[in-house]
Amino acid sequence: MVQDSAFLAKLMKSADTFELKYDFSCELYRLSTYSAFPRGVPVSERSLARAGFYYTGANDKVKCFCCGLMLDNWKQGDSPMEKHRKLYPSCNFVQTLNPANSLEASPRPSLPSTAMSTMPLSFASSENTGYFSGSYSSFPSDPVNFRANQDCPALSTSPYHFAMNTEKARLLTYETWPLSFLSPAKLAKAGFYYIGPGDRVACFACDGKLSNWERKDDAMSEHQRHFPSCPFLKDLGQSASRYTVSNLSMQTHAARIRTFSNWPSSALVHSQELASAGFYYTGHSDDVKCFCCDGGLRCWESGDDPWVEHAKWFPRCEYLLRIKGQEFVSQVQAGYPHLLEQLLSTSDSPEDENADAAIVHFGPGESSEDVVMMSTPVVKAALEMGFSRSLVRQTVQWQILATGENYRTVSDLVIGLLDAEDEMREEQMEQAAEEEESDDLALIRKNKMVLFQHLTCVTPMLYCLLSARAITEQECNAVKQKPHTLQASTLIDTVLAKGNTAATSFRNSLREIDPALYRDIFVQQDIRSLPTDDIAALPMEEQLRKLQEERMCKVCMDREVSIVFIPCGHLVVCKDCAPSLRKCPICRGTIKGTVRTFLS
């Protein structure tokens, strides 16, 4: 400590008027911590202190007083300042230093002797405070050069390890990593740095520690499972590499929070809560949008929970599902069972342009009549361009459902209408292609999700298809190189792309290799397609089986159906399988919304 330093004792004796500040922002105080620093370290204590480091007392490990960066294992030729600047360039202390100013740099500015007798060592100004660059022996008579670091926080009590906030810094800690089956690169990418003993690692953000790794473990998955509230995971959860993102520039929490600089002071929901829930501020009123699903919300009220509103209006948002989970979304949806009911009935009923406009409900106390919705200048302009009224109505309804407001400009509406037309054209082309398909290909396409889940004998199927020349050796290898969980889906997609001949070979191969699955996909279709009038002619057991099958999820073939797809209205999957689908497995129509149902 300072009191035990002979040099500092001499200094204070010869410069009684100096007020020495006892904290690590003072270089002299940092220097005093090196009294027990190991003698064999090839880096001088003075250069370490000058670079912002104080001695921790453990081996040759030092720590920056400002950013918390910890370094050890010093080697010949190491420059503390350069390593500090390289590993943590955003450190406030590093940023305040002029790289040209060092002990060997240009001569230091002199201070008048009168100033020397009155200026405290911890003197703070915008340019000079607490940065000592004089020599030991000449300090009492030589001037002192000061630099600003008052912006640096005190030593943080947060678990966040600033030193390890880059993947590169974390990777450097795995020099003695003992395991071969789990790569340091994956651990570092998942936020972990190595602390030992054994295979023990810690997260730089939440300080969560894990050990006893097994071969099947995935670093990122284990991190999420054990420490779901980790701030690093929350930001990572917003990464575009994990799911489709509507606005890439808003994928980080920091980017979203910056948009709230002009957030109305009268707003009833805190900006931090909105940013955490994936929303960024559009700059208008209290309108916010999700960076992932592009869903918009407005008119916030006291007590509103951004996560609940997100799950209420946009239950299929991938960011929402990743962060909060399907169970949370299902609970929220269960509280609003009739939210999309009227929209569904509107989609299923025939369009009558002369009929009275329907009312689409968007929340308690909020409604919008079609007659008003279709009377705005923007909508009228689109109608005058020749777009069909039914297409305009449907497009505007979905815009209001997704964002809570009508189109503001004609150009935006026209873009939406053109996209809707492209989507309709694509669906028509798919439907036409399916009509030309053989029965085998149509059945494989229709039951694709069932095959994804239940086709386990992929390798034998590959060899059968290869010997029948239904697929090429290159296509066979492409399937085998996929992870085990993706091989079935890749094989089915390959067969569907190859066409009728490959589908026939697939059917014949499946009959030999998995007769039970073959019956479910191909044989039982004859019974399923019987007219309703003919069911009574079936045996009682078959009637019961058919009734049970009607209530069974067509994807997992296990749980009861409970989700109605919008706009097609098909009720064919359970609440657990619905989020993974983008098109209805029955009609192949694009799923634009879902409604939870409860069968009695």
Swiss-Prot record:
Zinc finger (RING-type): 553-588
PTM annotation (Phosphoserine): residues: S138
Reaction catalysed by this enzyme: S-ubiquitinyl-[E2 ubiquitin-conjugating enzyme]-L-cysteine + [acceptor protein]-L-lysine = [E2 ubiquitin-conjugating enzyme]-L-cysteine + N(6)-ubiquitinyl-[acceptor protein]-L-lysine
Compartmental location: Cytoplasm; Nucleus
GO CC terms in record: cytoplasm; nucleus
Main location: cytoplasm
InterPro entries: BIR_rpt (IPR001370), BIRC2-3-like_UBA (IPR048875), BIRC2/BIRC3_UBA (IPR041933), CARD (IPR001315), DEATH-like_dom_sf (IPR011029), IAP (IPR050784), Znf_RING (IPR001841)
Keyword Repeat part of the UniProt annotation: yes
Modification note: Auto-ubiquitinated and degraded by the proteasome in apoptotic cells.
Subunit structure: Interacts with PRSS25; the interaction inhibits apoptotic suppressor activity. The BIR motifs region interacts with TNF receptor associated factors 1 and 2 (TRAF1 and TRAF2) to form a heteromeric complex, which is then recruited to the tumor necrosis factor receptor 2 (TNFR2). Interaction with TRAF2 is required for ubiquitination of IKBKE, degradation of NFKBIA and activation of NF-kappa-B. Interacts with RIP1, RIP2, RIP3, RIP4 and USP19.
Family note: Belongs to the IAP family.
Protein name: Baculoviral IAP repeat-containing protein 3
Gene (UniProt): Birc3
